[in-house]
Amino acid sequence: MRPAACAIVGLLAAGCASTAVSQPTPTPPPAATPAACSVTVSFGSYGMGVDRALVRQVEAYLADEPRVSKVDRRPHGREDEFDLCLTVAREAAARAVFLRIGALIPARSDRAPSSVSLPSGETIRTQGLSA
């Protein structure tokens, strides 16, 4: 009887097995690519931190600049380096903002490299240790 009981239990267990078809695991949507910046302002460091005075000047200008609709701070590095990604509605306005911030960037700095650039690649930057 024991073999018969085992056979019955085995048949019952097989009959109770799930017949559901496994579904593929859904993959998450790809991460959103950051929107292109109309103007990018970069604050770097030569080992002494970013140029805080310049950061304050640029932030003060941006606080009163109506043509800039969005400022996205993108940190990187280990010494508080970061980029500001500026959104400006019109290309002509972006160029004006670019030139105004470019006028704030010092021509030379042995402390911290800073730059402002347009998507076209046009850039105004400090000359520093490598120059």
Predicted regions and their residues:
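Bacterial N-terminal signal peptides that target proteins for export
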Residues: 1-8
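C-terminal motif of bacterial Sec signal peptides marking the signal peptidase cleavage site
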Residues: 12-15
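Bacterial signal peptide processing site
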Residues: 17-20
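Short glycine-/aliphatic-rich beta-strand segments at the starts of folded cytosolic domains
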Residues: 30-47
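Short, surface-exposed ligand-recognition loops at beta-strand->loop->(often short) alpha-helix junctions
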Residues: 43-53, 89-92
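Short amphipathic alpha-helix segments
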Residues: 49-70, 101
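Short, intrinsically disordered low-complexity segments
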Residues: 65-100, 124-127, 131
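A short amphipathic beta-strand at an alpha->beta junction
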Residues: 109-124
